[in-house]
Amino acid sequence: MKNLKITVFADPVCTWCWGSVPMMRALEYRLGDKVEISYVMGCMIEDITTFSNRRLGIGGDIALSNRNMHKVWSEASAVHGMPVGDKGLMLFSAEHRSTAPQNIAYIAATVYKHKANGEEVCPKRFLRRMQEATAVDMAHTCDVDVLADLAATEGFEPQRFKELMASREVHRIFDDGKALCKRYDVHTFPTYMIEYKGTEVLLRGFTSFDTIMQNISHITYGKIALADANEFAPTAQNVARYIEHYGSAYPVEIATVFCMQRISGKSALNVESYKGLPDVVEELIAQGDVAMRPRGNGFILYNKHHKDYKPLTMEEIATMEGA
């Protein structure tokens, strides 16, 4: 059992939870087996028709809520750096009014355990795919059938996955998670509970990698901190290794794990927004190690072994440079 635990109270639909993915990846990649990370699903919206956030104009009217939620996501993406889709959001409908299905789907993934061939499934990878499908692809992930199809892309058997989503065990875990949110007075997603040898610290809301590492260092009395190892220097070789490890990465994910400084006044979505990153990416593209492609209102970098690896044509590059 690991001494350092981080529990993330979240909802897969929450844009700030999507925006916290770079930080969670950085913790996983930099700290490795020193930390245990788990998620508690809190269900941000039980029913959009009875939900009310007057400041953001979300709740009540379904069509208006979809439009305003997309506006909020687009504005937030320039801050947190994870892209969102540029087409209209149709997340909620008269038949699908809750974010509970996405929460339940993640829990089902944790209960699923093994594929038919005995290979272990990866719930966290499915969580990321579900968040990406919701935010970037604008998929109708409130629909159980859509979620089952998404799960299939990560190795889950769709029918078994849907059966688990409907199971008592999964719904009990879901209810326990909501009860835990109530116990810790969690109303903001994401919220982080850092635990170390009986001591707990709560960080409420979207935060930076630097801030969470400061809290980790404090609660562990400096025993767990970022090492200045050569493997984490922001070199082309190290960045290539990181992208290869995950298969793909958005610019902000690379900048976060390698602690690249964001240039003031620039959107968090772009490569040129981070000091030193343009030169690294240019070198990797020239070597054929990665390919950069448009993704939503941002860009993604694919490792050369990724199924979606496809270098940009000269026409596409010219279009991007003129944008």
Label each PLM-derived region with a short phrase:
Residues 16:
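Short, cysteine/histidine-rich loop/knuckle motifs that typically chelate Zn2+
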Residues 8-9, 13, 21-29, 115, ...:
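C-terminal cap of thioredoxin/glutaredoxin-like
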Residues 1-7:
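Extreme N-terminal starter segment of soluble prokaryotic enzymes
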